[in-house]
Amino acid sequence: TEVIAVSMDNKEKALKTKSDWSIKNLNIAYGLSEDDARKWGLYISKSIKEAESDIFCEPGLFIIREDGTLYLANTSNMPWARPDLTDFPAKLIFAEENNYPVRGNY
């Protein structure tokens, strides 16, 4: 299992954020294009604060199976609607152990 965070930020800003937030055990990918963010169904926003990039994507959470199929997709148009990840690992273990099927595919 591999966890990767992906950002539309450039390398410098992504690495600064990783350092500022004390993120140690998470790979950060950067340079996601607006077009690719839209293909993933991510909402695009314009900055409202000086610290924000001019154009950026709102958060999304995706789980891709080893065979490349999408297992979970969660997107939001508001940053404060991010899912609480506290219990997320336990929920993933439950889903795997119980062979929980993909939902919302109709």
Regions flagged by a language model, labelled:
Residues 1-106:
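Chalcogenol-based redox active-site neighborhoods
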